[in-house]
Amino acid sequence: MRNGPLVLVAVLGLSLAAPAVAGAAPWLDARQSPDRRAAELVAAMTLDEKISQLHLQPDAEHQRFVPPIPRLGVPGFRIANGPAGMGPADDKPQKPATALPATMALASTFDTDVARKYGRLVGAETRALAHNVSEGPDINIARVPRNGRTFEGMGEDPFLVGALGAADIRGIQENGTIAEVKHYAANNQETQRQSIDEHIDERTLNELYLPHFEQAVTEGHAGSVMCAYPKINGVFTCENPALLQDKLRDDWGFEGFVQSDWGAAHSTVGSANAGMNLEMIDGTWYGEKMKQAVLAGQVSEQRVDELLLPRFRTMFAFGQFDHPPVLTPLPTARHDAAAKDFAERGMVLLRNEHAQLPLSSAVRSIALIGPFATKAKTGGGGSSAVIPTSTVDPLPGLRARVPGAAVTLDDGSDPARAAALAAGAEVAVVMVGDNETEGKDRPSLALEGNQDALVAAVAAANPHTVVVVKSGGPVLMPWAASVPSILQAWYPGQQDGAAVAGVLFGDVNPSAKLPITFPAADADTPANTAAQFPGVNGVAEYSEGLQVGYRWFDAQGRAPLFPFGHGLSYTTFAFSGLSVRTTGDGATATFTVRNTGHRAGAEVAQLYLGFPSAAGEPPRQLKGFSRVSLAPGQSQRVTIRLAARDFSVWDTGRHAWTPVKGGFTVQVGDSSRSLPLQAPLKR
């Protein structure tokens, strides 16, 4: 009892001191607006203090770190890698986090609610591990499927990427963590990534490579944007006023801060004038060189203030001054369950002849084979790598699901030995994949090593072969027609073994769709010349224009291995009754989806719009999707709304979106190549 009054006095002393501090430092008064607080803070800073806040300054524990200013009550500012969990590779000591499935798996869900939950987990763990910013999501369009960072993105379609990216951002930021959407813009290859000059025409840039960034700002309300490595039409993105000022701030209303990618800044004056707010990783351009530029009158101190205000305003708006993030234990059991759920939802059933899947729980023997069957595939390589809190490898995952079955593991290094094992098993499950990584592109979409030979040998030995593909993007499958079932699992994350088992045995009915086209051959890609990719003499020509992904396949009349939007279920669905009508400057399409099978399941209804031929657009473009969950025999009317922007193209004469007049075609179905419903629409 004796200590009680003393504790009370101490607490009262702290609470009474707070207004005094706020009076001397009004920016610490949470009753004021973020804009006012930021302005008051910057006005109180010395020039040296201002410059110290323009760039990262690694310390003994953190690489991506802006140090505090105790005199002014400015907290330290820590930045974490994303986008599939808190990637702490730069921290010392490194901190484990939940390794979620790759965002390519997230994109496969075609589900904005799932994307928001995914982001919410990333944001919560980023804050719990005492960081202010999550560098993600990565929403660059998959122009080149061989890109080493395909796994970090969300596919090839700007409409899909924009919808899911905005939802992911909203989820990240629910926890007071700032989402830093990246890489702005057209960061589409790793080869020569820090110097490549991408020649992109104005229409293509605005129709394919910018709309999803616009959504990240206008719908996701991203607090930060990372400017990318490449040049676009001769100008590095981090010193490109057309991108950082004209588009981002003036046209889209962005109020947050722009941070450079690691070493992506190339100037002091140019970057400052363009609107790059924060240099990563050190002060090469925004340190002493910035101070000298100010003293020489090349950059005004007012401009320095203007560069600082957006980050401080964002920190105030996110409560990071009033409640800085502190280390907090992670709810690992709950987040493990979420990681498993995300992985299951993102797996795409590519092929399932004779309804081989789901497997029966009564199976007696399973041959588990392949280089990706030995341990969990938690993610790709590079800055996005997450140190998992735990892992479920494929073997224990299968054994836990079917404890009565004999499951035997073979790493697949000897196809003949693996085939012999498969021949003696009731079912063979072959796990193959790739190892995409930041910093280099894949030389081919073919599986490395002997994996193709392995699948062929096992399939020949056992007619009940299931192939599970763990890849970051498309891979070639010369054996596809010889195996009855193919499950695209992407990089499933730390719950790999449990999630794959859940889908194989029907605990989950797959409903995911491909967010990227799987070609049949390396040459079957839009950027298929050296001039287009990786470029010649440091220049990559985007001469394919608008024909990227499924748009190119449609325009060329070429059949892919598996089309964009494709994905099977353990049940079947039918579409009927399409009705399209104009509503103001937009339109609505209404149709019926019916579950014609014997299991409950979900279908993703996709709407594609074909423009009048004179518009010069690809044959069809995704403009809407809707996920529908149905019991056997159940049907539901679905409505998808189209906005005026959906009927517009970028006019290079007016430098603006312009509505197209004429006859449009609305198509509805379950993939870009399976569209049973069609209706004309005159505008």
Annotate each predicted stretch with a short phrase:
Residues M1-P5:
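Positively charged n-region of N-terminal signal peptides that target proteins for export
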Residues V7-P19:
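Bacterial N-terminal signal peptides
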